[in-house]
A protein has these predicted regions:
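Generic structural marker for isolated residues within well-ordered, non-membrane alpha-helices
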Residues: 67
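Pseudouridine synthase
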Residues: 448-452
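Extended, charged/glycine-rich binding lobes that contact polyanionic ligands
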Residues: 1-45, 51, 59-64, 73-441, ...
């Protein structure tokens, strides 16, 4: 077992599905080492359509910030740009965007590390999660053992195969725990669930100040800015020293300087999807802790028990939440068989105002997680911004990975590596520059996280993912 990880603790991402020795290593040593290709649902092209459809490749762009820049370049509101999901930042990502702007205007946009391929026009918007899945090609560099000593490719490949076989025996073929990955919470700065807690408590000043001041794994310029605001509040001086790329923080501060005490208005300066993400992030911590609690109680994630809530899994690997049912003793055998075949999945809680709840032993486990997080008295209603009120839902506790391949790749030259690699191994990290490099290829359904699958094989602190 690898060392304690405070980031993992804060988002509930602790423990593993099976025992075993990981391969260590680090992700994203080079931007090209992490590639995501979205498997899009078909968008019907119509020359008379209102919207422009484009396949856009981003290199080292955070999705929300790119959308803001694209909106400005097109002269439109960011709310007129539609996409199916946010992707990893330090990566090469390719996905569909639907843009409410003339095709010629979009075609003229030129941005660094952005390739825009115009596909045509459409009447059809796309929404969050409106894609089939993602294909990943990811290189893990610097493999090592639990003591930080380098391991070769043969040893690394054997460890991967051993863990994969153990997961198949425990969970089923091609299944892994459906943990919600660190990027949902703000990689390196898990601010969103903390802000989300303040939002559902209707404490808007704390929500804004937390977003502005919570420190994470950021550079010195950003840390100094956050420290200044934490110690001095929102001032013109703080606005003057804000790093230019922190556009959301700048907008929030300007709003308060112009309209003192309008904390709800300041929070609204965040993009709508990021506002909602704060609520989803808090729900996600609950879900991750629920997976861990079920594992700790030695209850299978893939074989149901009496009282569980199960739902149908469609052909794209998505849970159909509208038809979930409770497991009863008379249906247990049939449901177990369908879970084993991948047709049904056991679900865990994403709490809200009216979420369907299990019964029996798992009900007590879910309640204990809510109690431990001091959320038992929470209504999940957000009066000032009603669209942030959530009914709650449930999420499959395991998900599938397909087309899984892993192989050795050569160690890359030092000159091609990023700063994370060049700065060397830091205290608490588990990788070694002389260790083997392994390339993984696999496909995941929409809403599942590559980092949480690789975490099962690497077993490293989250800052290495």
């Amino acid at each position: 077992m690898y060392g304690e990880d405070s980031l993992a603790d804060s988002i509930g991402l602790t423990g593993y599905s099976v025992d075993g020795d990981g391969i260590g290593g680090v992700l994203k040593s080079r931007i090209a080492d992490f590639r995501v290709d979205e498997i899009s649902t078909s968008v019907k092209i119509d020359p008379r359509g209102r919207f422009t459809v484009a396949n856009i490749t981003l290199t080292n762009w955070e999705t929300n910030r790119f959308v803001g820049k694209l909106a400005k370049a097109c002269g439109i509101s960011r709310n007129r740009i539609f996409f199916a999901g946010t992707k990893d930042k330090r990566a090469v990502t390719k996905q569909i965007f639907v843009i409410d702007a003339p095709q010629k205007r979009v075609a003229k946009v030129e941005m660094t590390d952005v390739e825009i391929e115009i596909l045509g026009r459409t009447h059809q918007k796309i929404g969050f999660g409106n894609h089939k899945g993602n294909r990943f090609t990811i290189v893990v560099r610097g493999c090592c053992d639990e003591n930080g000593q380098p391991i070769g490719a043969k040893e690394a490949l054997e460890r991967i195969d051993t863990i994969k076989q153990s997961m198949e025996e425990k969970l089923g073929n091609g299944l892994f725990p459906n943990w919600i990955g660190p990027q949902r919470f703000g990689s390196g700065r898990p601010v969103t669930p903390i802000v989300g807690r303040e939002v559902i408590n209707n404490d808007w000043e704390s929500a804004v100040m937390t977003y502005l001041t919570l420190e994470g794994d950021e550079n010195e310029e950003v840390s100094n800015f956050r420290k200044h605001v934490r110690e001095n509040g929102i001032t013109q001086e703080g606005l003057d020293i804000i790093p230019h790329w922190l556009g959301f923080e700048r907008d929030m501060m300007r709003h308060i300087l112009e309209k003192p005490n309008d904390w709800v208005g300041a929070f609204r300066r965040l993009p709508n999807n990021l506002q909602l993400m704060t609520i989803h992030a808090l729900q996600s911590v609950v879900f991750n802790k629920t997976i861990k609690a079920r594992l700790d109680n030695d209850i299978s994630l893939s074989t149901p028990i009496d009282g569980d809530i199960v739902g149908r899994v469609d052909d794209n690997g998505q849970l159909e939440t509208s038809t979930m049912v409770a497991v009863e003793s008379r249906t247990l055998e049939r449901i177990s068989r369908n879970c084993k075949l991948g047709r049904l999945a056991i679900t865990g809680q994403l709490p809200g105002t009216s979420m369907m709840k299990p019964k029996g032993e798992f009900s007590e486990i879910e309640k204990s997680v809510i109690d431990s997080m001091e959320l038992s008295q929470t209504s999940w209603r957000v009066e000032e911004i009603g669209r942030l009120t959530t009914k709650g839902t449930r999420r499959a506790m395991v998900t599938s990975f397909q087309d899984f391949q892993f192989e050795e790749v050569p160690i890359a030259g030092e000159e091609t590596m990023g700063e994370k690699w060049k700065s060397g191994v830091k205290d608490g990290e588990l990788w070694h520059p002389d260790g083997a490099c392994i390339r993984f290829r696999f496909t995941l359904p929409s809403g599942s996280y590559a980092t949480t699958l690789l975490r099962e094989f690497m077993r490293v602190p989250l800052k290495q993912l």
